[in-house]
Amino acid sequence: EGAALHLEGGGPGAVEPAGAPEGTTITVRDLFYNTPARLKFMRKDSAETAAVNGLMQHLALSHPDISFKFIKDGVEALLTPGDGKLDSAVYAALGRDFARGLVPVSGSGGDITVSGFVTAPLMGRGSRSMQVFFVNGRFIKSQLLTAALEEGYRNQIMKGKFPGCVLSVTLPVTAVDVNVHPAKTQVKFAREHDVFDAVYHTVLDLSLIHISEPTRL
């Protein structure tokens, strides 16, 4: 037996017994019914849907052991298997074409470890939109990590193309500050040079052996 929690208008809700399968289901309806003035500041439905879908993708990629399903207006937009395999989550969340162009990488530098997938040098992309980074399990946007990734591909990728990746960087929690951005999508590293080197050498080791054909997923 499960439990149901209903929240309305931000007030406290009551927890009631409910029959439910294993897992958690979150349903959002009439989000701005009591704050209609905020509704006019929302972007188009397509943009908001893309933002929610992006959030679900990042959650799925950072927790491949959990199955995520995103339903929008009754249509399934995302479903991951939750089998604990990152490549399965990448395939489900980011698509077959992207997943099939990836090769696995892993490396370390002292107490910093780097693991995940990157595109093979001949599978460069037209933008940086498929560069996905996690630090200690948290999705972030980082110019430092982007620079380290792309420096590792220098002279190995076609000019005007960019590598794609799903990379996880793990380091001591004392070596990274996650409270530098309200959305916590940016971090400050205490040892930026060490982090850069760990990512750079992980990618460089791949490019130096001239891998041009991706692993088929």
Each language-model region and where it sits:
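N-terminal phosphate-binding caps/lids of nucleotide- and nucleic-acid-binding domains
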Residues: E1-S212
